[in-house]
């Protein structure tokens, strides 16, 4: 197995274990956990930028009002996504948290078609229809409207759509997003 495959495997293992971690923190206020996640993500991302010597792009981004607004919007959307996900898992609604990530691609497709005027082929439409039927079947089995799953899935789809307007590398982008919501997190912690 090559290095890239091992990295992908490692990511999926960590991603799969993440709900267990959040569930272990169920006794802690979810908003506090979210605030800590933002703070530590920001610190870690800043460290990565400094190590990779990419830190000099931050002042240029901070001077650009349009970019600041875009990063703030992305930061707020990822904060909603992270926060609702943490809350969903902490309250034992694991199935709903999982369902969100089945809904997300469908939301992304709708956004792509409506906002970016992307077109799907007939085969792609069949795939979307099958995915939609599968998600709706899961929703019916769930027994109620999985509103937290909708919030998680939709917030991540909107986040992805906004990210199309960001030209920076991924580590710069997530750093700026967490930096933009850092005052909210610090305000909550203090």
Q: Model-found features: residue ranges?
A:
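Hydrophobic transmembrane alpha-helices of multi-pass small-molecule transport proteins
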Residues: 45, 123-139, 152
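Hydrophobic/small/kink-forming positions within alpha-helical transmembrane segments
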Residues: 16, 20, 46, 75, ...
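Specific transmembrane alpha-helical segments of multi-pass solute transporters/efflux pumps
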Residues: 57-95, 137
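Glycine-/small-residue-enriched transmembrane alpha-helix faces in small-molecule transporters
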Residues: 1-32, 136-165
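Structural motif at transmembrane-helix junctions in multi-pass transporters
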Residues: 27-32, 83-100, 172
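C-terminal transmembrane-helix exit sites in multi-pass transporters
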Residues: 87, 104-123
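Membrane-interface interhelical linkers
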Residues: 1-10, 43-71, 122, 174, ...
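Residue-level recognition of pore/gate-forming positions within transmembrane alpha-helices
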Residues: 38-42, 102-106, 128-131, 178-182
């Amino acid at each position: 197995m090559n290095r890239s495959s091992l990295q992908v495997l490692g990511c999926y293992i960590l991603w799969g274990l993440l709900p267990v971690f959040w569930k272990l923190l169920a006794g802690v206020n979810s908003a506090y956990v979210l605030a800590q996640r933002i703070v530590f993500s920001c610190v870690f991302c800043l460290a990565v930028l400094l190590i990779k010597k990419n830190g000099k792009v931050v002042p240029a981004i901070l001077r650009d009002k349009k970019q600041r607004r875009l990063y703030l919007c992305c930061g707020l959307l990822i904060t909603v996504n992270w926060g609702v996900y943490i809350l969903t898992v902490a309250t034992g609604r694991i199935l709903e948290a999982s369902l969100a990530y089945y809904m997300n691609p469908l939301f992304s497709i709708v956004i792509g078609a409506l906002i970016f005027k992307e077109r799907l082929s007939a085969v792609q439409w069949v795939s979307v229809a099958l995915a939609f039927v599968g998600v709706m079947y899961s929703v019916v089995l769930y027994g109620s409207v999985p509103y937290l799953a909708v919030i998680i899935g939709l917030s991540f789809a909107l986040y992805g759509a906004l990210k199309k307007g960001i030209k920076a590398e991924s580590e710069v982008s997530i750093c700026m997003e967490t930096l933009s919501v850092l005052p909210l997190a610090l305000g909550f912690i203090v």
